[in-house]
A protein has these predicted regions:
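Conserved GNAT-fold acetyl-CoA-binding loop/helix
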Residues: 15-42
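Conserved GNAT acetyl-CoA-binding A-motif
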Residues: 108-120
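Conserved G/P- and acidic residue-centered "switch" motifs that form tight phosphate/ATP-binding loops
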Residues: 95, 124, 150
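Conserved acetyl-CoA-binding loop-helix of GNAT-fold acetyltransferases
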Residues: 93-106, 129-133
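Conserved catalytic-core motifs of GNAT/GCN5-like acyltransferases
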Residues: 67-70, 75, 117-120, 132, ...
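A short beta-loop-alpha structural element at the N-terminal edge
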Residues: 2-14
Length: 165
């Protein structure tokens, strides 16, 4: 497995993973699949802002991807980012997501970020444990702030310090 910066040629693989997550899970609180054009614009915007889009690949193609972006747009939040990581369904549990998130830490540090946030559906205990194993701590629980699959969803925020405290 190789972890590297995603290129435009990786976007069809990212798109497949992203749309599968939208259709089958509450990891993304969205209902509508995105197009390759949408993903391309998203990727170009991340790159233009200096934010990484990391990809894990092997001989079978794209295994997963990770990225981070601004947590909030106000200047006082400029040292805080929120990350996302999504892995192809047939590769979960093999450490792909862990390596993708770990690859973000030095990139955030290089941009002088102080805290990384993870927003996780509260019912996804596996993802909460995953983040805790990577050094994230629970920071808040927001009740019924999302809605998908005809039910209300709670959101858990976790945070990890990137730089010195």
């Amino acid at each position: 497995m190789e972890i590297r910066d995603a290129g435009e040629s990786d976007l069809p693989g990212l798109l497949t993973i992203y749309n599968d997550v939208i259709a089958t899970s509450t990891a993304i609180y969205s209902y509508v699949p995105v197009t390759l054009e949408d993903r391309t614009q998203w990727w170009r915007a991340r790159v233009a802002m200096g934010y990484p889009v990391m990809v894990a690949t092997d001989a079978s193609g794209v295994l997963g991807f990770s990225t981070f972006g601004d947590f909030r747009t106000w200047p006082g939040y400029r040292f805080t980012v929120e990350h996302s990581v999504h892995v192809r369904s047939d590769t979960r549990g093999r450490g792909v997501g862990k390596e993708l998130v770990k690859a973000l830490f030095p990139r955030a540090a290089a941009l002088e970020k102080h805290v990384m946030i993870a927003g996780v559906d509260a019912a996804n205990q596996a993802s909460i444990r995953f983040h805790e194993q990577l050094g994230f701590e629970r920071a808040g629980h927001l009740r019924e702030v999302g809605h998908k699959f005809d039910r209300w969803l709670d959101l858990v925020f976790l945070q990890r310090w990137i730089g010195p405290r």
